[in-house]
A protein has these predicted regions:
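A compositional/biophysical signature of low hydrophobicity enriched in polar/charged and small residues
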Residues: 1-75
Length: 75
């Protein structure tokens, strides 16, 4: 299941979050951006359950992550 995860990050933590997110299984790439959100991550997981685990159990628990918004690719 492919998705874009938009991540808002506490000031001063963007580089740390990009580095940590990039190393997670299922994350294809993560990029810091100007403006909000601070980080865009493109992920690809086998199914919705794995996507949920990646976002809720891993990304949202990283130090500096304030909020995530997930957009599932439909095409």
């Amino acid at each position: 299941m492919r998705a874009y995860v938009l991540i808002n990050v506490r000031a001063g933590k963007v580089r740390d979050v990009v580095s940590a997110v990039s190393q997670l299984e299922g994350v294809q790439h993560a990029d810091a951006c100007w403006g909000l959100p601070d980080v865009f991550a493109y992920v690809d997981t086998p199914n919705e359950k794995n996507l949920n685990q990646l976002v809720v159990d891993q990304i949202q628990k990283l130090d500096g992550v304030e909020r995530t918004e997930t957009h599932i690719v439909v095409g």
